[in-house]
UniProtKB/Swiss-Prot annotation:
Record SMART domains: BRCT (SM00292)
Protein name: Microcephalin
Subunit description: Interacts with CDC27 and maybe other components of the APC/C complex. Interacts with histone variant H2AX under DNA damage conditions.
Record PTM Phosphoserine, positions in chain: S278, S286, S295, S332
Region (Disordered): 340-375, 417-445, 481-507, 562-593
Keywords assigned: Cytoplasm, Cytoskeleton, Phosphoprotein, Repeat
Superkingdom of origin: Eukaryota
Lineage: Eukaryota, Metazoa, Chordata, Craniata, Vertebrata
Modified residues (Phosphothreonine): T334
Pfam families recorded: Microcephalin, PTCB-BRCT
Compartments where found: Cytoplasm, Cytoskeleton, Microtubule organizing center, Centrosome
A single Gene Ontology CC term: centrosome
Domain BRCT: 1-93, 646-736, 757-839
Gene Ontology biological process terms from the UniProt entry: cerebral cortex development; mitotic cell cycle
């Protein structure tokens, strides 16, 4: 530090750049402090010196009014170099804006970043309030938990009892208190977010409420009568979102995969519960209480395993068993709360390699993609049935696993060969067993005669109308139906994707084409080799392909593999069937048979559930399907097959190039091209370019290349007027012929040429050599010369004209011309006089 030569000086520094955007006060403040002066951040009465440069007019006026010494930055520098207090009158400050009118007050804005001050409760009032609010909330929670909290409990006989005292282990709150204490000590600016609490619960399981023990008897937890289907969560007690709670449960369960039962480490404890509630009595005595405890959101939109809302369509795509997921992670217990009454659901792990699945129908929850007005009733009733513990329903040889859960489903190993037999044994919920829709589609358990009678009972009146999702068996409660064995032992399976209630007939037609008949109709085929499908109205616009959303995950691959083969066979076989309809009418019923039996390789058979061969049959209930639909169906499918193979539509052959255009206009052009179609955007002019759009009439390389190739050189207004008209309008009135006279001439020559267009501008000129140091680049300049009919040599000794600066030995017989000669000649569409473009020798 220098000697305190300015110890009596109290300075106020205001030094700005001349344009008022940069504040340089800090540099001079440091120098003044080093010399012993005091620097004030505000202009107060103690200030004796003002270091001023291009500052505020108000500061200047205030300094003059108070008689404070106004000095320039040179005074500070002179004091520093001289090491003494220099006379202030030698370096007076200047105010350049003093005599200018101050009508427009320019706002000063410093572009330098501000110093970052770390927020603590001491220097930030908002953080202090938040800190105090958290502390008060913690104190209130501790007070309410330490006191006597009366609660209502269900006794084993189903009656309500009043428990005067219940104390819950407050490990969660002690963790919060510990966190606040750490914040007080360290003065951290972090609040305990949910992610931190989740991490804390993973590190120390005893500090998480989800692992806080609640004394429900081990017999209730491990018995076969334990319930699994009430999708409530700990949100009412814990305060966490469903997502955080599910993540915490998942983390806890993965750590305990080695143990046979992870329930024992996750038992929630209460001090004064004398007997475990009987879930059978809850089902019998108080079903209304269970209904009231299930929220509407929970009924209609159940959560999946990571806490997000699962819509019915998403459940269809991912609708395989919960057991698959929970077997994988060794069964994390499912927690439920019904107004203070806590339930823990658990299932014992099966000892066998294959999972044992419940084969009675009432345990399988229906899929919610059936009728929407029944969605609430259908989603509640199976959950109530899950609470039943009657002994007559327990027919399990070993430790039985509970039924599937619609809300917490996964399809991790649904296609595993171990699960094929288990999926065959799955039955359907009793609600869906209606007279018009036979519920069981197991072809092995029904004779051919029985299947024929069931088929005759089926109602085909809905064919051709606006289709609803069929009530039959809730589409076997799976997106992919279980493989059905036929009489001859040949395995057949079908995709049963479901369309929404509002799907129109054309959309369903296309779905039927691409997904091998996704709309299952009621009844089984009399031949017993698959299911019956409906082919809807084939009058479908061809541009409808992009409206379909494929299924998720593994189902997407299966759908594409089966759907593509199905569409190909459907077109060909339908045509054959239509041509031979007269011959076959005496032997068979008149029907449009579309056989989708496709040979698969051994590897594909394994991937597609042991061989995906489906039979799609259509009953002749609509004569428009019979009369002329086969040929139109074939024509309809062809473009979709091509789109399926290529993955996207065919690109336009014409390209459009933009030049001298700001990004805002470029974005508008791109949007208009996307809307009106017919063009693709290219960065540079190429063989396919037909239009060059110029935002300003500047001679750019793209404009010159567009002229040389005979393209339209248009103004930006052409795009705007085309957008106004809704289609591409005529280009003549928007051509930039005034600025580029050669453009319309070359364009007409291009239109009149039979083959690929090549100009004749430089056809009569001798061989040229383009210098490597030329500007524009050599490649572009050579391309321009070549497009205009000129000949370009790679070596200078063969050329009679050298374009661009040339540093080698010059010959008297060779013309050394500037690059502008080529550019001006192309622009004017005539060879300019070379004398005006000669380079100095």
């Amino acid at each position: 530090m220098a000697a305190p030569i300015l110890k009596d000086v109290v300075a106020y520094v205001e030094v700005w750049s001349s344009n008022g955007t940069e504040n340089y006060s800090k540099t001079f403040t440091t120098q003044l402090v080093d010399m012993g002066a005091k620097v004030s951040k505000t202009f107060n009465k103690q200030v004796t010196h003002v270091i001023f440069k291009d500052g505020y007019q108000s500061t200047w006026d205030k300094a003059q009014k108070r008689g404070v010494k106004l000095v320039s930055v040179l005074w500070v520098e002179k004091c520093r170099t001289a090491g003494a207090h220099i006379d202030e009158s030698l370096f007076p400050a200047a105010n350049t804006n003093e005599h200018l009118p101050s009508l427009i007050k320019k706002k000063r804005k410093c572009m330098q970043p501000k110093d970052f001050n770390f927020k603590t409760p001491e220097n930030d009032k908002r953080f202090q309030k938040k800190f105090e609010k958290m502390a008060n909330e913690l104190q209130r929670q501790k007070t309410s938990l330490d006191g006597d909290v009366p609660i209502l409990l269900f006794e084993s006989n189903g009656s309500l009892t009043y428990s005067p005292i219940i104390k819950i282990n407050s490990s969660h709150h002690s963790a919060m208190e510990k966190r606040l204490q750490e914040m007080k000590e360290k003065r951290e600016n972090l609040s305990p977010t949910s992610s931190q609490m989740i991490q804390q619960s993973h590190d120390n399981p005893s500090n998480s409420l989800c692992e806080a023990p609640l004394n429900i008897s081990h017999d209730t937890l491990c018995s076969d009568e334990s319930i699994a289907g009430l999708h409530s969560s700990f949100d009412d007690l814990c305060g966490y979102s469903g997502c955080g709670n599910q993540e915490r449960k998942l983390g806890g369960s993965i750590n305990d995969t080695k143990s046979a039962m992870c329930v024992s480490s996750l038992v929630l404890k209460t001090n004064h519960i004398h007997s475990s509630p009987s879930f059978a009595h809850l089902d019998k005595s108080s079903p209304q209480k269970f209904l009231s405890n299930l929220s509407k959101e929970e009924i209609n939109l159940p959560r999946n395993i990571v806490g997000k809302i699962v819509t019915p369509d998403q459940k269809q795509a991912a609708g395989t068993s919960q057991e698959t997921f929970e077997e994988k992670y060794r069964l994390s217990p499912t927690f439920s709360s019904t107004k203070g009454h806590l339930l823990i659901h658990s299932r014992p792990r099966s000892s066998s390699v294959k999972r044992k699945r419940v084969s009675y129908g009432f345990h399988s929850p229906p899929k919610e993609k059936c009728k929407r007005k029944r969605s609430i009733r259908r989603s509640i009733m199976p959950r109530l049935q899950l609470c039943s513990s009657e002994g007559s329903r327990q027919h399990m040889a070993g430790p039985a696993l509970e039924a599937l859960s619609c809300a917490e489903s996964s399809y991790d190993d649904y296609f595993s060969p171990d699960n094929l037999k288990e999926r065959n044994s799955e039955n359907l919920p009793p609600e869906s067993q209606l007279p018009s829709s036979p519920a069981q589609f197991s072809c092995r358990s029904l004779s051919k005669k029985e299947r024929t009678s069931m088929f005759e009972m089926s109602d085909f009146s809905c064919i051709g109308k606006k289709t609803r999702t069929v009530d039959m068996t809730s589409f076997t409660a799976k997106t992919i139906s279980s493989p059905q064995k036929t009489a001859n032992g040949e395995g057949r399976a079908t995709l049963s994707g479901v369309t929404s209630e509002e799907s129109s007939a054309p959309e369903e037609t296309l779905r039927c084409c691409r997904q091998a008949g996704p709309q299952q109709k009621e009844g089984a085929c009399p031949e017993g080799n698959g299911f019956s499908y409906t082919i809807e109205d084939p009058a479908l616009p061809k541009g409808h392909d992009g409206d379909l959303t494929p299924l998720e995950g593994i189902l997407e691959e299966v759908k594409e593999a089966v759907g593509l083969k199905s569409t190909q066979d459907k077109g060909t076989t339908s045509k054959i069937s239509n041509s031979s309809e007269g011959e076959a009418s005496s032997e068979h019923e008149p029907r449009s048979v579309v056989d989708c039996n496709v040979e698969r390789s051994a590897e594909e058979k394994e991937n597609l559930l042991g061989g995906y061969s489906g039979s799609v049959k259509n009953r002749p209930t609509r004569h428009d399907v019979l009369d002329g639909s086969c040929d139109s169906f074939k024509d309809l499918i062809k473009p979709h097959e091509e789109l399926k193979k290529s993955g996207k539509g065919k690109k336009p052959t014409r390209t459009l190039v933009m030049t001298s255009m700001p990004s805002e206009k470029q974005n508008i052009v791109i949007q208009v091209v996307d809307k009106l179609k017919g063009f693709s955007i290219a960065p540079d002019v190429c063989e396919t370019t037909t239009h060059v759009l110029s935002g300003k009439p500047l001679r750019t390389l793209n404009v010159l290349l567009g002229i040389a190739r005979g393209c339209w050189v248009l103004s930006y207004d052409w795009v705007l007027w085309s957008l106004e008209s809704g289609h591409w309008i005529s280009e003549e009135s928007f051509e930039l012929s005034n600025h580029f006279p050669a453009a319309p001439l070359c364009r007409r020559e291009c239109h009149l040429s039979a083959g690929p267009y090549r100009g004749t501008l430089f056809a009569d000129q001798p061989v040229m050599f383009v210098s490597p140091a030329s500007s524009p680049p050599v490649a572009k300049l050579c391309e321009l010369v070549h497009l205009c009919g000129g000949r370009v040599s790679q070596v200078p000794r063969q050329a009679s004209i050298v374009i661009g600066p040339y540093s080698g030995k010059k010959k008297a017989t060779v013309k050394y011309l500037s690059e502008k000669w080529v550019l001006d000649s192309i622009t004017q569409h005539k060879v300019c006089a070379s004398e005006n473009y000669l380079l100095p020798q």
